[in-house]
Amino acid sequence: MRLPQTLVLLAALLAGSTLTAEEKLADGLYAEFTTPRGVFVTELFYQQVPLTVASFVGLAEGTLAPRDGKPFYTGLTWYRVVPGFVIQSGNPGLKDTGDDSIPHKFPDEFVSGLRHAETGMLSMANAGPDTNGCEFFVTLGDCTRLNYLHSVFGRTIRGLEVLPQIKPDDAFSIKILRVGAAAQAFKADPATFAALLAAGVKYSGAAEPGPATAFDDPAKVLPTEVPRAKNFNYKLANFQRATGRQIFARVYPAFTPTEEAKTPAPFTQQLAKSLGIHQSGVLAVYFADQDRWYVWVGDDLMPVFNPDHQKTMDVKNALYAAVKAKAAAYTELARAARGPDNPLKPADLAKYSVDAMLDLLLFQFESKPKS
């Protein structure tokens, strides 16, 4: 006999949704998720990303956008469950971030070091830059490719084993836990949210990729069913918004020699000059027919790229090898997920190579040079 969803959730509550003295948490702000499969707890990064956390806490506690006298986050279900990827919720009874019932929108908050690199990261769903509202997701594995596209604002510290057990349409509740004076003092009221919103750094990058933008795929080498080039451009523009550092990338079907650049290396250097990033930026160029990358690093960023003063070509070759390995891993995961009846296309393989290169470059250039 199958129990109604409400009884299953009640059973989970009675089984121990409240933390005991033995499970005492360190000072901080937390969200306790009670599901039919068990309880998991996420630490909220309220000091690093206060706007995002204020929205989440306000919607959970009812201080922002209450619905019918109850917190907005009442009656939630996990309406998107992708095994090995994410579980998603946040819009009661709805499944689309484009719906008019979203209580508010606010800009992204990207902080170096907050990454989708492991299971249990709590992050905002969106429909593009600065379209955060109420929907959030929790990662079910390494989702590094989501970095600088979605704002990470929490990390699961207890109950990781619960996450892969979540089923579509499982009901759940959220309880905010405040431990310590700083967490107790953190406000999520309309005035605080409005002040944080006014101080937010807005997206100023291009809406579409093009000749002068951070990313471009002029010949449409990458898949177009989902706008991959557009999303890669958002990612690199967001990285610059967060760090001040410019990383550009270009994808071409093949290299075409010119009088000025008879081989890919000088072509990449000349392109960096024409884009205005020759001295202070990074340019990665991919030629699909060779499945090969060429990277230019400006002198201003060379201490970050090569902090140990090795031969620059050795460092680049190590990067290229790491990209190959990471792209191969992405490819194998995709093949396994698709199965033999839905083989990968050349455009997909190019996409995984771009994922790998950008993941590694963003990780490298988040860091500071050695003193």
Question: What do the predicted segments below correspond to?
Answer:
Residues 135-137, 283, 294:
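Residues embedded in well-ordered beta-strands
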Residues 5-6, 108, 265:
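Generic low-complexity segments that are intrinsically disordered, proline-rich and/or Lys/Arg-biased
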Residues 1-8, 122:
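Bacterial N-terminal signal peptides that target proteins for export
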Residues 35, 126, 140, 251, ...:
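Flexible glycine-/small-residue-rich
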Residues 19-209, 233-234, 370-371:
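Cyclophilin-like peptidyl-prolyl cis-trans isomerases
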Residues 178-281, 289-371:
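A structural boundary signal for the start of the first folded domain, especially the loop/turn
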Residues 6-16:
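Bacterial N-terminal signal peptides
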